[in-house]
Amino acid sequence: MDPKESLTPPSREEIPSSVLGRERAHVMDFYKSLRGGTPVKVSAASPSLAAVSQPDSKQQRLAVDFPKGSGSNAQQPDLSKAVSLSMGLYMGETETKVMGSDLGFPQQGQISLSSGETDFRLLEESIANLSRSTSVPENPKSSASAAGPAAPAEKAFPKTHSDGAPEQPNVKGQTGTNGGNVKLFTTDQSTFDIWRKKLQDLELPSGSPGKETSESPWSSDLLIDENCLLSPLAGEEDPFLLEGSSTEDCKPLVLPDTKPKVKDNGELILPSPNSVPLPQVKTEKEDFIELCTPGVIKQEKLGPAYCQASFSGANIIGGKMSAISVHGVSTSGGQLYHYDMNTAASLSKQQEQKPLFNVIPPIPVGSENWNRCQGSGDDNLTSLGTLNFSGRSVFSNGYSSPGMRPDVSSPPSSSSAATGPPPKLCLVCSDEASGCHYGVLTCGSCKVFFKRAVEGQHNYLCAGRNDCIIDKIRRKNCPACRYRKCLQAGMNLEARKTKKKIKGIQQATTGVSQETSENSANKTIVPATLPQLTPTLVSLLEVIEPEVLYAGYDSSIPDSTWRIMTALNMLGGRQVIAAVKWAKAIPGFRNLHLDDQMTLLQYSWMFLMVFALGWRSYRQSSASLLCFAPDLVINEQRMALPCMYDQCRHMLYVSSELQRLQVSYEEYLCMKTLLLLSSVPKDGLKSQELFDEIRMTYIKELGKAIVKREGNSSQNWQRFYQLTKLLDSMHDVVENLLNYCFQTFLDKTMSIEFPEMLAEIITNQLPKYSSGNIKKLLFHQK
C-alpha cells in the first residue's frame, strides 16, 4: 500500500483542508467549528511530548498566514494552545525552537518522535466529543483568527511500538481551555480505542524506514521534503551542515517505554517528569563529511570508540541514491561514516580538548585512523580508506574531529624504530667515528694512533705484503698498514693546528667586534690569510710513499758475495717498479711529457733506492747497518765479504748524514722528490719550463718542512744549506755505485743475475753515461 494513499484524507466533506508542514512535515487540520476560519499553515518543530499548560504561563505568539479572502470572517479565538496532548507535538517555528519551558509549561521529558513511524489520520469524531476533551494549547504562531466557520483540526496518532500498542502521552490530568469551556478530548479511554482501531487499518509499507529501525534519529517520514532529512541532527538554518558538516559526537537516542498504563478504575498512570530521561542529539560542526541520507548505526568490532552508519541501495524518496559527500565528492552505494560513541565522557572531553578556530592547526592524522577503521568493512567500502587529507586545510575550520585524533595508545611501528641517520664510520678501521680528527672522520683509537705514530717518528714495517686488513678487530695487528691507511685517508697534523689557529682567530675577532660600534659589529671579520684546509703536498707524499718490500733472502744458508749481490739485484728490480708507480703519483709529474718522465726515471732510479736505503738504515739501526729489507740487513760481517765493503761504505755515508742532521720525515720526502728531479739531459727536456716549475715547488716545500721542524728561527737557512749540500753529495755516491753496477752487468764471468726491468733500464742508461749526456742539477757550486 502506498504510504501517501494511507495518509490522504478520505473526502473533502470529512476533511475540509489539510496542510503539509513545510519544515517538519507534520499534518494538522483544525475543525471549522473550533477554528472559525479557513485552514491555516502551521510549521511544527522537532517532535516532542507537549506538556499541559498552566493559567500563568507565558504565551509566545507567532504569526500564522491565512489565504486571501478570509479577512471578513469573525474573530477567531486564541489557538496558541490548540495542539492535542495526545499528538505528542508542540508548535513553533524551527528558528525559534520553542520548548515547554518557554511557554511556561512544566517541562516534561522529551521523546523524539520518528516521522517515519507516525501516521496522521482523521478522527471520525464529532465536535461534541472533542469539546469534552482537554483544550488544545494555544498556538504561538496565531496572532489573530479570521472570521468564518471554524476549521476542523486533524488529529495525529501517537507513536506506536513494534507490537502495535499506541504510545501514551505524558499527561498529568490538567485541562487547558481555548478561551472558553470547549474541551477537545474526553478523559475516558474511548479516544484510545478509536486510535487502536484506526491504527489496525493502517498498513505501512514493508520497506518503510519506520519498520527498519524504530528509534533511529535518522529515520524520516516518507512525505517530508528532502531538506528535512537532517532534522534529527541539527537545525534547518545550520550553514555548516549545508556546506559539508559532519556529526562529531553522535549520542545514541534511547526512548523510554511510553506504553499507556491504566489502573483498574480507568485512570492513567503517568510517569513523573524527572523519571523520563531527556534524549539529546548533539551535533558538532565538521568540515569534510555531509550526511544526507538516513542510516543504521551499528557498533564496529575494531573498538568501542567508533560506530559506523551503513547505507545500501537506493533511497525510497524520489528514487534517488543515498549518498555521502566527502570533501565535495558524492559517493553512492554502501558507505561508511564513523561517529564518536563515547557518550559519557565525550561532552566534557570536547569542552576541554576542543581547539579554537584558527589557533591550533588541524591534526593531519585523519587518514591513518580512517584506514584502521575500514578494516572490517566490505571490499566496496574500502575506497574511503584511501582518501587524501592533504588538502583538508581548505575545508577545515581549524580543528579536526575527535574521531580523527591520533591513537596514542597504539604501539609504534617497526619502521619508525629504525628511522634516524646512520652512524658515521671511521675511514681507517670502519669503527664508529667520534669526530673529525686531523682533517679526517675517524674514531678515537685511530686518532691517538696517528698522533703517536707521527710525533714518535716510528718507521713501522709490515710482516706481510703491506695489504693487511684494518678493521675494528684487527687494527692493532699491523701498525704499518694502519699508519699507511691513515695517510691514505688524508690525516694530517696540520689540520689540527689549523683548527686551533681558526679558533684563536675567531676568539680574537669576537673580542674586537665587541669593542667596535654596532655597525662594525655586524660586519664579518675575515682573516687576512685563510688557513689551508686542503691536504698539503707533504701529506700527499706521505700517502704515496712506497711500501717496504721483502727480499726473500734465506739467512739459514751461508752468505756469499754472489748470493747477496743477486738478492740485492732482484730486490732492486721490484723497488724500481715501485719507484715508477710512486713517481707517477707525485703531484705534477704526470703533467710532463712522457719521454721526459722516462728520462727522469732512468737518470734517478739509483738516487731513489740509495736515499731510501739510507733512511731505513737511519731509522732502524742508527746508521750502523744497511737495512735493505726487513729480512736482508747487511751487518759488518757481511760487509767484510769480497767486493762488498767499498760499496757498503758509500751507502753508509748517506745514512750517517741523515743521522747527523736528524732529518725529519717531511724533509726526507721533499728531498727524495728533489732527487727524482736532480738529473736531466744536457739538451734539456721537452717540458723544461714545467719541469723547472715543479722542481721549484718542491724546493719551497722543503723550506716549509724546515720551518715546521725548527720554527721561526735564524737556523732555517743554515739547515736548508746543509740539506741541499747533502743532495749535491748524492751525485758522487750514486756515480760510484752506478759504475760498479755497470761493471757487474757487463762482466758475464761474475754470473750475477739482473731482473728484466733493471736490465732494460741499465741498457738504455749506459750510452747516455758513456757519451756524457747528463746534466747534474746542483744547489751549490763546487
Swiss-Prot record:
Q: Where is this region: Disordered?
A: 1-20, 48-79, 130-184
Locations listed in the record: Cytoplasm; Nucleus; Mitochondrion; Cytoplasm, Cytoskeleton, Spindle
Question: Is S-adenosyl-L-methionine one of the keywords?
Answer: no
Q: Which residues bind DNA?
A: 426-491
Q: List the keywords (alphabetical).
A: Acetylation, Chromatin regulator, Chromosome, Cytoplasm, Cytoskeleton, DNA-binding, Isopeptide bond, Lipid-binding, Metal-binding, Methylation, Mitochondrion, Nucleus, Phosphoprotein, Receptor, Steroid-binding, Transcription, Transcription regulation, Ubl conjugation, Zinc, Zinc-finger
Where, per the database record, does this protein carry N6-acetyllysine?
Answer: K485, K497, K499, K500
Similarity annotation: Belongs to the nuclear hormone receptor family. NR3 subfamily.
* Notes concerning its domains: Composed of three domains: a modulating N-terminal domain, a DNA-binding domain and a C-terminal ligand-binding domain. The ligand-binding domain is required for correct chromosome segregation during mitosis although ligand binding is not required.
Q: What does this protein do?
A: Receptor for glucocorticoids (GC). Has a dual mode of action: as a transcription factor that binds to glucocorticoid response elements (GRE), both for nuclear and mitochondrial DNA, and as a modulator of other transcription factors. Affects inflammatory responses, cellular proliferation and differentiation in target tissues. Involved in chromatin remodeling. Plays a role in rapid mRNA degradation by binding to the 5' UTR of target mRNAs and interacting with PNRC2 in a ligand-dependent manner which recruits the RNA helicase UPF1 and the mRNA-decapping enzyme DCP1A, leading to RNA decay.
Protein name as it appears in the record: Glucocorticoid receptor
